[in-house]
Amino acid sequence: MSFNDNVQLDTSSIGSGGGGGGGGRGGLVVGGGIGGLILAILAMLFGGNGGTLPTTQDQTSYGDNVQSVDDSAIKQQCKTGADANKYVECRIVGTVNSAEAYWAQELPRYGKKFREPKTVIYSGATQSACGTASNQVGPFYCPVDESIYIDGSFFDILTQRFGSDDGALAQEYVVAHEYGHHIQNVLGLLGRAQQDPQGAQSGAVRVELMADCFGGMWAQAAATTQDANGNTYLKPLTQDDVRSALSAAAAVGDDNIQERAQGRVTPESWTHGSADARQNWFIAGMKSGNDINKCNTFSVDDPETQIAS
C-alpha cells in the first residue's frame, strides 16, 4: 500500500539499539513472529536452540558488527508519507503509525486499554530484553520490553530466499504481523504459544495465525487511519497490494520454508502454520468487519483448514 505524500510521520515510538541492554536473556521471545521461523530453520540447518533467540552467552559476540540505525537520522529522514514510499525504514515508521492509530481505536471496544509498543529499527544486530536480535533472525516481538525489533534488510531475504514479491504491502504485512503480537500481549493471549509450542494445531501456530488475521484487519482499514492532522496515512487497498501481502504470507509458511530447507514437510514440527493457512487467516482478518472475534484461532478445531465464524 502506498502512503499519501502529505501525511506526517511520528517517530516518537521509534528507537534504535536494544531495549534490554547487556547480553543475558531477560525472557523468551513468545510469538517470535516471522523471525522466529527463520531462526528455527537456521537451527535445523546449523544446530543450536531453535526455541529462543540466541544471546551472547550461546553465540559469538557481534562486537564491532553491532550497528544501530541512528535515531536522529530516522527523525530527519522520515517525516512524510513521501519518505515512507521512498525509504524502507520510513515505511516501517509509517506502518507502525497507522497500526497504532487503528488499534488505539479498536481495542477499547473490547474493554482493553491500548498501550503503545516501542519499535526498534536496527542494522546488523542489537540487544533486546529477550536476547540478541540479528538480521539472521528477522523481525520479532519481545513481550518483556514490549518492543518490535526489525532490520530492514530482512525484506531482501524475504524476496530473494523465500519467494515473496517486493511490493509495499508485503513489507507492511510483516510489520503489521509483529504489531499483532503486541495486541495479543495486551489481550493476554501471547503466552498460549509457550503452553503448546509445536505442531500444525498447536498453540504456537494458532498465535501466529491470529497475528496474521490481525494484520488483515489493519490492512483492510489502513486507508482510514489518520495522522494528528487528520490526513489519512495510506491510499486505498488494491488487488495488487493484496497479492503482495499474500505472497509474503505464503513465503513464510512452515511448509514452504521446510520444503526449501530440507526438501520435505514435517507438520508435527510447525510453529507458524502453512502457507495456505497464513493466507487464509490474513484474508479472514480483511473480511472480519473489524470484529476481533473473527480472528479467534482457538475457537476452531483445526486452524489449518477452518476459519472462525
Task: Please provide the spans of the model-predicted regions.
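Post-HExxH zinc-binding segment in Zn-dependent metallohydrolases
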Residues: 2-16, 199-230
